[in-house]
Amino acid sequence: MTKAAELAKMGEVLTNSQLGGRRNIVINGAMQVAQRGTSSGTGGVGASNGVYPTVDRFIFEAGNTAGRLTMTQETISDLSGFTKAIKLDCSTADTSIAADEFLMLGQRFEGQDLQQLKKGTSDAEKVTVSFYVKGNANATYTLELRDNDNSRSNSQEFSVTTSWNRVSMTFDGDTSGALDNDNALSLKCNIWLHGGSTYTGGTHTSNTWHGTTNQRVGDNQTSFFDSTDRTFF
């Protein structure tokens, strides 16, 4: 995945730089900075929760799964305008999915950096997330905005093919639940890669803010851990 960089208010120019005071919220969306190293190593990701394996700012949340993956920063030449991407590669499959299993890749945001979204007011702003993605085979995953202050979520499914595809999704503003104006975690932008029925068991309604745990993941979700052939860029 590259350029998960574009999380910004609807109507703003979605770039990696500021323009006329408009700014992108995601940091390191072009995947260029990897101060911790360019590879997660052979042990694999999935055993621990809250891990930053390689590229700066991108965190894995994982729990209760036997599946494992490796994460590397890759140099690419097949996507115009970009030289880096992350590659996720399934190293251990998990096809017996318990209810409470989960795996997400995402970025976290402090409430003080999100007050321009006006969440919890009648003037709540829409949010657009856009990025490029590809994989070894067709797949469907879920992108979620998770309000950590009020335990609310809004999610939409997106498709992956074997070629680079630009995904762009706009999320409605949420008039319920203001974000705290401080330096604590308030919002997560998560890509769901794997989830059990605790998160998938309900009927998913796209682009709707809610507080129901089993509706966080889309009905057509692919498990990244379904095969050791599975990759995600």
PLM feature spans:
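Extracellular and organelle-lumenal recognition/adhesion modules and their flexible linkers in secreted
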Residues: 3-233
